[in-house]
Design a protein with these regions (language model features):
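Alpha-helical junction/boundary sensor with strong preference for TPR arrays
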Residues: 26-36, 68-73, 94, 101
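Short coil/turn linking the two alpha-helices of tandem helical-hairpin repeats
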Residues: 7-16, 49-55, 98
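Outer membrane beta-barrel transmembrane domains
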Residues: 34-42, 47-53, 57-74, 78-80
């Protein structure tokens, strides 16, 4: 219930006056939901982040949901339908976000990796391709 209230606090001007910080409240609700095996608060966080237009919060919502949806964190059987609906909500928000920015829906890794994420540059690549990308040491270069 607190996650739902927090979403309302973010969406309706003046509704959050005198209330706790809405995103902190949603994060607390997400932790409770993870322990109980229900990720509805994650979906509400994604919806609120989408409505706010804050890319950082939206990506955090996607990554938080993905981290909470691993095989070692199964859904509570009593609330499987609600959990499944929450997953569909997050996937729908992700698909819309991806489509607006890239023209295609979110792929399998679309909740954790994004099109503009910087790739880690690995110097190990040169070790395996024979060093073709690296300059020869000065001693092996012809004198000028």
């Amino acid at each position: 219930p607190m996650a739902t209230r927090a979403v309302i606090w973010t969406l309706l001007p003046g509704a959050g006056d005198g209330k706790p910080a809405p995103y902190a409240t949603m994060k607390e609700s997400m932790q409770i939901g993870e322990k109980k095996g229900v990720r509805l608060a994650h979906a509400l966080y994604a919806v609120a982040a989408q409505a706010s237009g804050d890319d950082a919060k939206l990506r955090d919502a996607f990554r938080s949901y993905a981290a909470a949806s691993t095989e070692d964190k199964p859904a509570n059987p009593q609330f499987r339908l609600i959990d499944k609906m929450a997953g569909l909500m997050v996937r729908g928000v992700a698909d819309r976000y991806w489509t607006e920015n890239t023209g295609v829906r979110a792929g399998d890794e679309g909740l954790t990796t994004f099109w503009d994420d910087k790739q880690e540059d690995s110097s190990l690549d040169d070790l395996f391709d024979g060093g073709s990308g690296a300059e020869a040491p000065a001693e092996n270069q012809p004198a000028e």
